[in-house]
UniProtKB/Swiss-Prot annotation:
Similarity annotation: Belongs to the beta-microseminoprotein family.
Localization (cell): Secreted
Signal sequence segment: 1-20
Protein name stated in the entry: Beta-microseminoprotein
Xref: PANTHER family: BETA-MICROSEMINOPROTEIN
Record-annotated disulphide pairs: 22-70, 38-62, 57-93, 60-69, 84-107
Assembly notes: Homodimer; Interacts with PI16.
Short name of one Pfam family: PSP94
Keywords in alphabetical order: Disulfide bond, Secreted, Signal
Organism: Papio anubis
One annotated Gene Ontology cellular component of this protein: extracellular region
């Protein structure tokens, strides 16, 4: 029974990670353009097959034909919203959930959404 439960937990984690919110942007190249790089929305250039993290907490990858960026932010949804509040820590790209009356005390979280 424990093996079955452990397998379910691993499967649920995998499904959650696979549902990450991603955006796709064409890597615009022009005839005769032999550069092997992508230009992101801020105008920064990245080599083909390179990866980087944006200021908006996205993990991006440069491919020949597109740039794919996926959010790194997991949003807590399974917590006591009457007793607790979520706080976004931009420098860490994550939320924490703390008690409203005592922000030094964290709250348990049952569910996250990517």
């Amino acid at each position: 029974m424990n093996v079955l439960l452990g397998g379910f937990v691993i499967f649920a984690t995998f499904v959650t990670l696979c549902n990450a919110s991603c955006s796709f942007m064409p890597n615009e190249r022009f005839p005769g353009d032999s550069t092997r790089e992508c230009t992101d929305l801020k105008g920064n250039k990245h080599p083909i097959n390179s990866k980087w993290q944006t200021d908006n907490c996205e993990a991006c990858t440069c491919y020949e034909t597109e740039i794919i960026c996926c959010t790194l932010i997991a949003t807590p949804v399974g917590y006591d919203k009457n007793k607790c509040q979520r706080i976004f820590k931009k420098e860490e790209c994550k939320y924490i959930v703390v008690e409203k009356k005592n922000p030094k005390k964290t709250c348990p979280i049952d569910q996250w959404i990517l």
